[in-house]
């Protein structure tokens, strides 16, 4: 074997060593990045992110590993908050003033308005999964249904739409094994069918971002343990399965803020033990977190920020 051949073989050996080192370094870097990632999910890669508030309220927050920042919607954004009485209490905790202050400090023009939906008449004072599905999916189109605007109408005027359920949503009956999207009966299986239709419908309007509250809880005096457990099961499903990263739908975890990880609205956060409306204490706590969550969604952090609105 001549000198030229020996030199060629030596060059090949050195190249192999260098490639091996490079591959090992890349793999190690990827492993380091994975191990240092502080984003959590509720799947097998999940870890808990528990936050304790000054008032002692504790929340368990999860976000998805596939989450990425999205583009900001800009500085001029119209926001519509659809609600009933529970939402009205939180609104009264200072939501409007929070946005006024934020706009003044940040030079933005985030314009938020609230609206009762659906109204007491002619539709009826019901804002549960069936009712949103009935108005927005079952009666979709450019014409109002019983004087209630469809998504085709709302999205033509609004950049962000926030919707929620009032606390009777947590009074859930047992499943019967036959989910019915057209049923007004409050069961987990019916809720899931209605939420599936709502997700598909909201995704038809990619220029509009939606913020969905996890449902309001009932006090212990107002609900059974079985029903309250079903409520927690459903709202956990909303967070961990129904809500997916990368689309135009986001969740604000009001249920977790209310229940502190339990099954009921605690009496110290309720209007009274047998009145499941939130009190002023909870409203003052929740209002800025709600407002911050909406801003996170507007500014592209909907999939990466905490779903309670905490920093």
Language model regions located:
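Oxyanion-hole/transition-state-stabilizing segment in secreted/luminal serine hydrolases
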Residues: 135-189, 215-220
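Serine-esterase "nucleophile elbow" of acetyl-processing enzymes
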Residues: 64-116
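A short beta-strand-loop structural module common to alpha/beta enzyme folds
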Residues: 103-140
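Structural recognition of the beta-strand scaffold that forms the well-ordered cores
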Residues: 78-82, 88-89, 110-116, 159-165, ...
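Bacterial N-terminal signal peptides that target proteins for export
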Residues: 1-10
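Catalytic His-Asp segment of secreted/periplasmic serine-dependent ester chemistry enzymes
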Residues: 218-311
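Ser/Thr-rich, Pro/Gly/Ala-heavy low-complexity intrinsically disordered linkers and tails
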Residues: 21-68
């Amino acid at each position: 074997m001549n000198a030229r051949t020996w030199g060629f073989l030596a060059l090949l050996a050195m190249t192999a060593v260098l490639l091996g080192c490079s591959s090992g370094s890349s793999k190690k870097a990827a492993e380091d990045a994975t191990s240092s990632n502080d984003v959590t999910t509720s799947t097998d890669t999940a870890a808990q992110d528990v936050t304790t508030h000054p008032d002692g309220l504790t929340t368990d927050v999860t976000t998805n590993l596939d989450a990425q920042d999205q583009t900001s919607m800009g500085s001029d954004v119209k926001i519509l908050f659809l609600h009933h009485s529970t939402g009205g209490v939180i609104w009264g905790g200072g939501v409007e003033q929070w946005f006024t202050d934020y706009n003044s400090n940040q030079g933005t023009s985030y314009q938020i308005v609230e609206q009762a939906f659906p109204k007491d008449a002619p539709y009826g004072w019901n804002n549960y999964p069936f009712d949103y599905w009935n108005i927005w999916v079952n009666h979709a189109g450019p014409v109002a249904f019983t004087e209630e605007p469809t998504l085709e109408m709302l999205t033509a005027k609004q950049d962000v739409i926030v919707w929620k359920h009032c606390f009777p949503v947590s009074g859930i009956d047992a499943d019967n094994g036959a989910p019915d999207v057209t049923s007004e009966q409050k069961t987990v299986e019916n809720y899931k069918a209605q939420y599936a239709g709502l997700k598909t419908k909201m995704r038809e309007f990619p220029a509009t971002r939606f913020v969905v509250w996890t449902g309001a809880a009932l006090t212990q005096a107002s609900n059974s343990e079985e029903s309250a457990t079903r409520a927690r099961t459903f709202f956990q499903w909303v967070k961990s399965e129904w809500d997916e990263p990368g689309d135009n739908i986001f969740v604000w975890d009001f249920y977790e803020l209310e229940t502190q990880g339990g099954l009921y609205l605690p009496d110290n956060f309720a209007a009274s033990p047998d009145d499941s409306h939130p009190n002023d204490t909870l409203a003052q706590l929740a209002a800025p977190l709600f407002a911050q969550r909406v801003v996170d969604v507007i500014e592209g952090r909907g999939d990466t920020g905490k779903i309670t609105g905490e920093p």
